[in-house]
């Protein structure tokens, strides 16, 4: 099953919208990140696997390919990747994904950690016509500055 979500990448004081594509198949095993991720994004694989296991979710028996459409850096892609995987697994509804941007780092126990650059991400989400920006609670006040 194919699903796409949105994330954002901060460059200076600006942000760009990043499409996160997730494809889930029954054959093969593993989580593969493609699309020029940096080391922090590549490490998302281990954080996401641990978060899934520690919250009772299983990816075993499935091949998950995640494509990021621009060169990316930072751990803020954990949440959009995890949401995309959950939607592809039909664990969460994908209904709101086309109008939502996600940003957040996952800890190994599945809780969200704050990320940097939420203000430019909120501006970008608004400018792109997205209706929601989902961020960790610690980033909510910063994101709420943008209407």
Model feature map: region roles:
Residues 1-147:
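Peripheral, non-AAA+ core regions of ATP-driven protein-machinery
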């Amino acid at each position: 099953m194919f699903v796409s979500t949105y994330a954002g990448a901060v460059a200076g004081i600006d942000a760009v919208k990043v499409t996160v594509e997730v494809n889930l198949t029954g054959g093969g095993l593993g989580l593969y990140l493609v699309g020029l991720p940096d080391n922090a994004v590549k490490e998302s694989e281990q954080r996401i696997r641990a978060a899934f296991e520690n919250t009772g979710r299983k990816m075993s028996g499935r091949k998950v390919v995640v494509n990021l459409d621009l060169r990316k850096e930072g751990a803020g892609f954990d949440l959009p990747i995890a949401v995309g995987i959950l939607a592809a697994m039909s664990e969460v509804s994908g209904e709101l994904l086309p109008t939502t941007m996600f940003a957040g780092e996952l800890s190994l126990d599945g809780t969200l950690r704050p990320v940097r650059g939420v203000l430019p991400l909120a501006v970008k989400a608004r400018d792109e016509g997205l209706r929601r920006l989902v961020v960790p609670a610690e980033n909510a006040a910063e994101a709420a500055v943008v209407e």
